[in-house]
């Protein structure tokens, strides 16, 4: 799937040997523009509020595309400790260590083509851009209760803002974010200690 996405972002369609062919700049937004058209069709057919989930945004430019267009767009990242994630991939999907390393490499934003920052997945950057971070421990493969509880929490907040007060961790994160914005560093790419 990642190769198909990279091909579409580079050429505007799925092609064999796409990395050897010329980069077409307008293709970078082909996927999100297509998804955006589908969203508009769904909203038009529903004639009411439509709740839409886009699964697995792995390119930061695609995330930014939706953030710029929809005020109610919330980018969520679901994180698990590396040990739990690799155990999950090994046991349930039967991936080898080499396959897991390849997945990590592909999704890290690294690559050897000249437009990799535009066309390759970059999960790390998408996590940085996330509005909501959800913790999903995978130490019990068939127990998703922690994940479900967090999703219910945030969906309730999206539908009814102010219904649930922020946790202590969320308050500290807000203070850190505010300190970052008040920084004298022009790029605002600084850490904050609270």
Show where each model-derived region lies:
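Short hydrophobic alpha-helical segments used for membrane anchoring or interfacial signaling
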Residues: 192-194
């Amino acid at each position: 799937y990642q190769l198909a996405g990279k091909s579409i972002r580079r050429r505007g369609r799925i092609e064999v040997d796409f990395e050897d062919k010329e980069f077409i700049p307008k293709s970078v937004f082909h996927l999100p523009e297509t998804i955006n058209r589908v969203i508009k069709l769904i909203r038009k057919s529903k004639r009411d509020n439509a709740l839409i989930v886009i699964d697995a945004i792995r390119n930061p430019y695609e995330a930014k595309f939706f953030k710029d267009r929809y005020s109610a767009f919330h980018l969520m990242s679901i994180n698990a400790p590396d040990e739990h994630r690799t155990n999950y991939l090994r046991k349930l999907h039967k991936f080898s260590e080499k396959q897991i390393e390849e997945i990590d490499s592909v999704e890290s934003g690294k690559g050897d083509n000249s437009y990799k920052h535009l066309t390759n997945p970059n999960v790390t950057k998408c996590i940085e851009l996330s509005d909501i971070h959800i913790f999903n421990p995978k130490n019990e493969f068939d127990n998703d209760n922690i994940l479900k509880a967090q999703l219910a929490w945030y969906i309730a907040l999206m539908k009814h803002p102010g219904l649930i007060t922020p946790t202590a961790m969320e308050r500290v994160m807000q203070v850190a974010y505010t300190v970052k914005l008040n920084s004298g560093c022009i790029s605002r790419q600084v850490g904050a200690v609270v």
